[in-house]
From Swiss-Prot:
Residues 136-373 form the Radical SAM core domain. Binds 2 [4Fe-4S] clusters. One cluster is coordinated with 3 cysteines and an exchangeable S-adenosyl-L-methionine. CDD domains: Radical_SAM (cd01335). The lineage of its organism: Bacteria, Pseudomonadati, Pseudomonadota, Gammaproteobacteria, Enterobacterales. This is Ribosomal protein uS12 methylthiotransferase RimO. Catalyzes the methylthiolation of an aspartic acid residue of ribosomal protein uS12. HAMAP family: MTTase_RimO. Belongs to the methylthiotransferase family. RimO subfamily. It catalyses: L-aspartate(89)-[ribosomal protein uS12]-hydrogen + (sulfur carrier)-SH + AH2 + 2 S-adenosyl-L-methionine = 3-methylsulfanyl-L-aspartate(89)-[ribosomal protein uS12]-hydrogen + (sulfur carrier)-H + 5'-deoxyadenosine + L-methionine + A + S-adenosyl-L-homocysteine + 2 H(+). Residues 8-118 form the MTTase N-terminal domain. GO terms for molecular function: 4 iron, 4 sulfur cluster binding; aspartic acid methylthiotransferase activity; metal ion binding; protein methylthiotransferase activity.
């Protein structure tokens, strides 16, 4: 007679941004440590957890559809994440959901799992959970979340109402996690938060400790410390505070990647004021010029919103003029979409959908031309590329100018003598508006 006990199985659906992905990784790590098995199929699972996004209406819809699918396919569902902060909205559509928690409610999620699917008896030494925890990214790169929440009150955003005000992680904890990731083979660390440049503001940049040494809780100190790990370090979601200037020399010295993801959102001072964003375009252009003088290899990524309430053709033209002058490398553009609970919903002069669409097309056409010209400048040069995947046709990787999922790729046709995570030198032979093609040197 077998004495093998049933190992409870959990299904998991993770939606939304990299910050949500990190939350999912933490929950999955705890579940695996406790002896739960994580399975990819609804019908194999004793229960399903759905980690939701609620940032914009399309994300809410996607989350509600994912919850519905999990209920139809499995029946036992726990919901967490940003949309979980709006329990009534979920219950109205899906009253049969077992439990709902808000974002970063790890302990509550685990308690609910224990209630419906009791913890197994298991030997923790047999769980085989890697020291760096369960990761949902490829082994060679990982997201490092340094804080939760945001102190800004941008009128298009409801993140603070879902994730709260800024709470910085202790710098010693952040650096210890980074060290574990590198020890496990990670070659690229992507620093994320709602507002990376505000790291430490909530604790008045107090001094923490790592390996017995004092370290200031600030973005610049964090970058200095991460540079000692000998891997690529990439900064995301950097609000344009003045002290961002202090990380540019670190990029010029090769300590962190010369890559800055800095969401500017618009270029019209009037629209920026309505958004409650910093609004001096001339000052921002001067900073970009100065950054490039200090670090000529700097890649600038940004995101913008067109069709924000009150945006006139004159405002939009200011945005196009800014693009022409700034010549940013990587740009994302969103058509403004009302989000339940956002202050911008109450603003007058909502822009018609057909006008949003027309402006978005003009924006993208201009930026694609700029991007193509910027990438064409790299043809004939040698660059470093981190390999993401390899098949019989060759390898696909990313340059220092390319973050995973959101930027371009470098195609190495016919190159099969590499593996994911390898960093190789490549001569660029061709380019379009997003991607590069080249051969290994």
């Amino acid at each position: 007679m077998s004495n093998v006990t049933h190992q409870p199985k959990i299904g998991f659906v993770s939606l939304g941004c990299p910050k949500n992905l990190v939350d999912s990784e933490r929950i999955l790590t705890e579940l695996r440590t406790e002896g739960y098995d994580v399975v990819p199929r609804y019908d194999d699972a004793d229960m399903v957890i759905v980690n939701t996004c609620g940032f914009i209406d399309s994300a809410v819809q996607e989350s509600l559809e994912a919850i519905g699918e999990a209920l139809n396919e499995n029946g036992k569902v726990i919901v967490t994440g940003c949309l979980g902060a709006k329990e009534d909205q979920i219950r109205e559509v899906h009253p049969k959901v077992l439990e709902i928690t808000g974002p970063h409610s790890y302990e509550q999620v685990l308690q609910h799992v224990h209630h419906y699917v009791p913890k197994p008896k298991h030997n923790p030494f047999l769980s085989l959970v890697p020291e760096q925890g369960v990761k949902l990214t490829p082994r060679h790169y990982a997201y490092l979340k340094i804080s939760e929440g945001c102190n800004h009150r941008c009128t298009f955003c409801i993140i603070p109402s879902m994730r709260g005000d800024l709470v910085s992680r202790p710098i010693g904890d952040v650096l210890s996690e980074a060290k574990r990731l590198v020890d496990a083979g990670v070659k690229e660390i992507l620093v994320i938060s709602q507002d990376t440049s505000a790291y430490g503001v909530d604790v008045k940049h107090r001094t923490g400790f790592h390996n017995g040494e004092p370290v200031k809780t600030s973005m610049v100190s964090l970058c200095e410390q991460l540079s000692k790990l000998g891997v690529w370090t990439r900064l995301h979601y950097v609000y344009p505070y003045p002290h961002v200037d202090d990380v540019i020399p670190l990029m010029a010295e090769g300590k962190i990647l010369p890559y800055l993801d800095i969401p500017l959102q618009h270029a019209s001072p009037r629209i920026l004021k309505l958004m409650k964003r910093p609004g001096s375009v001339d000052r921002q252009l001067a900073r970009i010029k100065q950054w490039r003088e200090i670090c000529p290899e700097l890649t600038l990524r940004s995101t913008f919103i067109v069709g924000f309430p009150g945006e006139t053709e004159e405002d939009f033209q200011m945005l196009l003029d800014f693009l022409k002058e700034a010549r940013l490398d990587r740009v994302g553009c969103f058509k403004y979409s009302p989000v339940e609970g956002a202050g911008a919903n109450d603003l007058p002069a909502q822009v018609p959908e057909e006008v949003k669409e027309e402006r978005w097309n003009r924006f993208m056409q201009l930026q694609q031309q700029i991007s193509a010209e910027r990438l064409q400048e790299k043809v004939g040069r040698e660059i470093l590329v981190i390999v993401d995947e390899v098949d019989e046709e060759g390898a696909i990787g990313r340059s220092m100018a390319d973050a995973p999922e959101i930027d371009g790729a470098v195609y190495l046709n016919g190159e099969t003598n590499v593996k994911p995570g390898d960093i190789v030198r490549v001569k660029v032979e061709n380019a379009d508006e997003y991607d590069l093609w080249g051969s290994r040197v």
